[in-house]
């Protein structure tokens, strides 16, 4: 049997596709394209939170006006549309872990958790319950057949590349998901929205963390976890106490501006000592990192990660969403997985993701990745930080 444009057997009219509709232009265009090609399209929107500020705030998603926009687009396309209340699930799976992670001194990525749990687990099951052959989304990433399964690849429009936030997608989920925008540049997506007469054609793209009004995540965390706003010391990596802070929630590793101390030297946040409410600062060279240890690894390579050669596997690693993939070596031994960064990186924070690729081109395959549990700096900085933490432990025990 021949395959249709979604690599599924059968004619489009015999293929049901659930489209995850956020109310934005991307997912709306996905619904429009598939409807135009003759697929049996069903739109589903998740209500994830209900902050009153989001109702009229530009750049939000999955609440207020966005749900209404998704409904209007579905109506104009002539497709059924359902709104599912996932607010409690979103709080449990995304918002609470986000706050807990900050309290522990990490810099979390809630978008990964949302994709990993709510969107690609819960919503995928809903799509199956609706009898769908696939779940389509407006993410900028590509997938294509790889033997009996499908593999992920970076999109044509690397400026919109969302593969960093999708590294935790499991093989089972990848096989069921479809990403119709992966081969299109954003400008063309806007043009298609105009052609289809979609009311959201000129709508602003979502910005920042969707559930954080005006991007002030510290307000949300302080409300959920008041201890994150406990004051403490700002300490130089060499042991000097430089001043006080109003809560580690206001800081992240690699930060330079707004530290709150003036010493005449350029200082960066090197480490967040959550247990002792301390912000550790130091010179830029103290941020230089060549090795990161990963947890919760999702490996999508063809060879099982436990079977990697002792010499490791040459890959390209991305440790921040805004940075390009850089040369690295992936290693796995004794139950641990780590990545050695050939050129080193600065400002690597625990809780962030390290995503692995076959190369640095826009056709690179995504090999998965993991969350950064800890990292190793240059030997001198590593020893200074170790000594500083050991002294704090002794003081606490005294």
Swiss-Prot record:
GO terms for biological process: tRNA wobble position uridine thiolation. The active site is at residues 114, 210. The record marks 139, 352 as: Interaction with tRNA. GO terms for molecular function: ATP binding; tRNA binding; tRNA-uridine 2-sulfurtransferase activity. Disulfide bonds join 114-210. Its EC number is 2.8.1.13. It is an enzyme of class 2 (transferase). One of its GO terms (cellular component) is cytoplasm. Belongs to the MnmA/TRMU family. Residues 160-162 are annotated as: Interaction with tRNA. This is tRNA-specific 2-thiouridylase MnmA. Catalyzes the 2-thiolation of uridine at the wobble position (U34) of tRNA, leading to the formation of s(2)U34.
């Amino acid at each position: 049997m021949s395959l249709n444009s979604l690599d599924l057997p059968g004619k489009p009219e015999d293929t049901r596709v659930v489209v995850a509709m956020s109310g934005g232009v991307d997912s709306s265009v996905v619904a429009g394209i598939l409807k135009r090609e003759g697929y049996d399209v069903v739109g589903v929107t998740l209500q994830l939170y209900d902050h009153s500020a989001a109702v009229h705030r530009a750049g939000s998603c999955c609440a207020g006006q966005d749900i209404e926009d998704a409904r209007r687009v579905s109506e104009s396309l002539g497709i059924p549309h359902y709104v599912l209340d996932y607010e409690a699930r979103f709080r449990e799976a995304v918002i609470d872990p986000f706050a807990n992670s900050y309290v522990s001194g990490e810099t979390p990525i809630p978008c990964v958790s949302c994709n990993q749990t709510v969107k690609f687990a819960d919503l995928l099951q809903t799509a199956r319950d609706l009898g769908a052959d696939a779940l389509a989304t407006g993410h900028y990433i590509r997938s294509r057949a790889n033997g009996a399964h499908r593999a992920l690849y970076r999109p044509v429009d690397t400026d919109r590349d969302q593969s960093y936030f999708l590294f935790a997608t499991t093989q089972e989920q990848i096989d069921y998901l479809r990403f119709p925008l992966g081969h299109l540049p954003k400008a063309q997506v806007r043009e298609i929205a105009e052609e289809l007469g979609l009311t959201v054609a000129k709508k602003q793209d979502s910005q920042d963390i969707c559930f954080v009004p005006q991007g002030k995540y510290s307000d949300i965390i302080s409300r959920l976890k008041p201890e994150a706003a406990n004051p403490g010391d700002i300490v130089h990596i060499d042991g000097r106490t430089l001043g006080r802070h109003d809560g580690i929630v206001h800081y992240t590793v690699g930060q330079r501006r707004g530290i709150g101390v003036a010493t005449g030297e350029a200082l960066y946040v090197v480490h967040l000592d959550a247990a002792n409410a301390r912000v550790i600062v130091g010179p830029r060279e103290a941020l230089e990192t060549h090795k990161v240890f990963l947890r919760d690894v999702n490996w999508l390579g063809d060879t099982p990660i436990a079977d990697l050669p002792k010499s490791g596997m040459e890959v390209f690693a991305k440790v921040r969403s805004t940075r390009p993939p850089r040369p690295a070596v992936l290693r796995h031994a004794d139950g641990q997985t780590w990545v050695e960064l050939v050129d080193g990186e600065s400002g690597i924070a625990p809780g962030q993701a390290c995503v692995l690729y076959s190369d640095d081109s826009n056709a690179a395959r995504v090999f998965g990745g993991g969350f950064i549990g800890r990292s190793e700096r240059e030997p001198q900085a590593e020893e200074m930080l170790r000594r500083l933490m050991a002294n704090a432990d002794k003081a606490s025990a005294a």
